UniProtKB/Swiss-Prot annotation:
Name by which UniProt lists this protein: Large ribosomal subunit protein bL25
Functional note: This is one of the proteins that binds to the 5S RNA in the ribosome where it forms part of the central protuberance.
Keywords, in A-Z order: Ribonucleoprotein, Ribosomal protein, RNA-binding, rRNA-binding
Subunit structure: Part of the 50S ribosomal subunit; part of the 5S rRNA/L5/L18/L25 subcomplex. Contacts the 5S rRNA. Binds to the 5S rRNA independently of L5 and L18.
Domain of life: Bacteria
Signal peptide: none
GO biological process, one term: translation
Phylogenetic classification of the source organism: Bacteria, Pseudomonadati, Pseudomonadota, Alphaproteobacteria, Hyphomicrobiales
GO cellular component: cytosolic large ribosomal subunit
Family of this protein: Belongs to the bacterial ribosomal protein bL25 family. CTC subfamily.
Encoding gene per record: rplY
HAMAP family in the record: Ribosomal_bL25_CTC (MF_01334)
Single GO term (MF): structural constituent of ribosome
Amino acid sequence: MSAVKPLEAVARDRVGKGAARAVRRQGRVPAVIYGGGQSPQSISLDANQTHHLIYGGGFLSTVFEIAVDGRTIRAIPRDYQLDPVKDTPLHVDFLRVVSGQTIEVEVPVHFVNQDAAPGLKQKSGTLNVVLHTITLAVSPDAIPDAVNVDLTGKDIGDTVHVSDLVLPTGASLALAPSETVATLVPPTKLGADVEAEEAAVAEAARAGSAAEAAKEG
């Protein structure tokens, strides 16, 4: 389960493009907390910390305890905007987390026990991943860091479907059970195979050159 993370914020009285630009000049990122049947709360966040949180992974599936004006607001990021040139954060939207509420979050899919998959370990097959993330409808208190797929015993030609995933208690998926998560496919020509093929081509070229030289002689 993802841990709730603390996050310091400063309340903003002014909103709009001009106010947002002024906030960014101060090394901060404008943000808003909305939902939960309450009025939106405009805040600003430290720009460096926000950058690290976004690029650290799992940002949109992490619940934060946001400290502002002497109180804390539990919220989860719903969206963020980046500068198209610098890739720095421009704005963040947070959704208030309400007790008993179910929310949709996107979490990564991790593939475990690959060494125990004969199709990968013994037969040098390739894991063709179709879904790197999945969207869960889950309680904010039960958001997992990832959904693990156990590859033990999987062979070439096997397929992992959405129905094979083990989900947290109370969580559900917005995908069809038959949808493909990953497949194990046969190995392709790599490494030694490519080198052997190149050597054969070079040998054929040398033989051809020798034959031409013999004709001219």
